[in-house]
Amino acid sequence: MKNIASFANKKVLVLGLAKSGESAARLLDKLGAIVTVNDGKPFEENPAAQSLLEEGIKVVTGGHPLELLDENFELMVKNPGIPYNNAMVIRALEKKIPVITEVELAYLISEAPIIGITGSNGKTTTTTMIAQVLTAGGQNGLLSGNIGFPASQVAQSACGKDTLVMELSSFQLMGIEAFHPQIAVITNLMPTHLDYHGSFEEYAAAKWNIQKNMTADDYLVLNFNQDWAKGMASQTQATVVPFSTTEKVDGAYLDGDVLTFRGEAIIKVAEIGVPGSHNVENALATIAVAKLRGIDNQTIKEVLSAFGGVKHRLQYVGQVNEVAFYNDSKSTNILATQKALSGFDNSKVILIAGGLDRGNEFDELVPDLKGLKKMVILGQSAPRVKRAADQAGVSYLDATDVRDAAHKAFALAEPGDIVLLSPANASWDMYSNFEVRGDEFLVAFEELKG
């Protein structure tokens, strides 16, 4: 690890636990910092806080008392889910206490180079594809970041021969100062998380932070299907490598049905292991990164053709009576569901949609819904989703939860049909996260299998 001495005896407040906060607290303690952890969940309901206390780390739980900041902290490591308008964060900044997130901490100690991936959709799939291609090419890609493996935990054991392949959320990227990936990917951008960021402009600015410290020796991989990316390409010091499914670019692109990099044919669309136009984009981004890292074409093709997807990301679950089930619980916005539907024949699809009501209308989804066999609709946003279904001429049933929806969808299906969970909404009206929602769909599938 690098910069070990710089944390010795430094007073650090870790604000918020979850996986990243717990990992950051342990790392800082290991580095010799004087660590205090503050989490809003009561101590008796907080196994992570209990565990840290047993290890000798000071914990303050059940709220965020402002007087805690009177203890002369020299650094705050903030859980990315805690917004910058939180009173503790505001007070820390007023007191000139540096506020970073756990990924910045990971960068400061990492001996391994970093490839960072962000975007509204496709982050996890692209991150996983890249890590698998690098590893197959002998470069040992280590998954980390917003993909379930805390970056600071992975960075501790990484060496210079490894590569940290880091999925990064807008929440995490707001808290970077020195963070410097050698390659960065922005898969796409669309309005999401506006309840956290306030506006699309602020959200986009957070994503754009990924290239903040990059130089001409670094590479920024951008989706030239989007005008936003084309417009921003001149606003970075990094060397831009584009990818596109709609035009030939100086990077990765679709030439007929062949994914190509600067004239070199890599793989046909039909040979990619996961369906959908969005996965073609994910594969193109992966190809761009792989070629920049010197991976040979055959290795790239073998990994992409064998790629089985990621849990909850258009995951093929299996079949019951020749009815296929796909779990796309990670589709928490309209674009993600549009991409999912693009991979199927609508006349065979029974779509399960709906979830947290963020006030969005679904007019943009109407063309993509046309021709669906049926929909099963649930959640707070059901009235808005139903309006879109009515406009598309698609009939629907109501469901109380995902399990109920899966059973009702299967009852409507015939051999050869597809039951697709792709909600186009966040999960928090019913479930703590999209993983729990997707897991309930998987449980329903097992029930239907008998």
Curated annotation (Swiss-Prot):
Binding sites annotated in the UniProt record for ATP: 119-125
Keyword field contains Membrane: no
Signal peptide: none
CC per GO annotation: cytoplasm
GO BP terms, alphabetized: cell division; cell wall organization; peptidoglycan biosynthetic process; regulation of cell shape
Pfam families given in the database record: Mur_ligase_C, Mur_ligase_M, MurD-like_N
SUPFAM superfamilies, A to Z: MurCD N-terminal domain (SSF51984), MurD-like peptide ligases, catalytic domain (SSF53623), MurD-like peptide ligases, peptide-binding domain (SSF53244)
Cell compartment(s), UniProt: Cytoplasm
InterPro entries, alphabetized: Mur-like_cat_sf (IPR036565), Mur_ligase_C (IPR004101), Mur_ligase_C_dom_sf (IPR036615), Mur_ligase_cen (IPR013221), MurD (IPR005762)
Reactions catalysed: UDP-N-acetyl-alpha-D-muramoyl-L-alanine + D-glutamate + ATP = UDP-N-acetyl-alpha-D-muramoyl-L-alanyl-D-glutamate + ADP + phosphate + H(+)
Family of the protein in this entry: Belongs to the MurCDEF family.
HAMAP family: MurD
PANTHER family, per database record: UDP-N-ACETYLMURAMOYLALANINE--D-GLUTAMATE LIGASE
Role according to the record: Cell wall formation. Catalyzes the addition of glutamate to the nucleotide precursor UDP-N-acetylmuramoyl-L-alanine (UMA).
Protein name per Swiss-Prot or TrEMBL: UDP-N-acetylmuramoylalanine--D-glutamate ligase
Native organism: Streptococcus gordonii (strain Challis / ATCC 35105 / BCRC 15272 / CH1 / DL1 / V288)
Lineage, highest ranks first: Bacteria, Bacillati, Bacillota, Bacilli, Lactobacillales
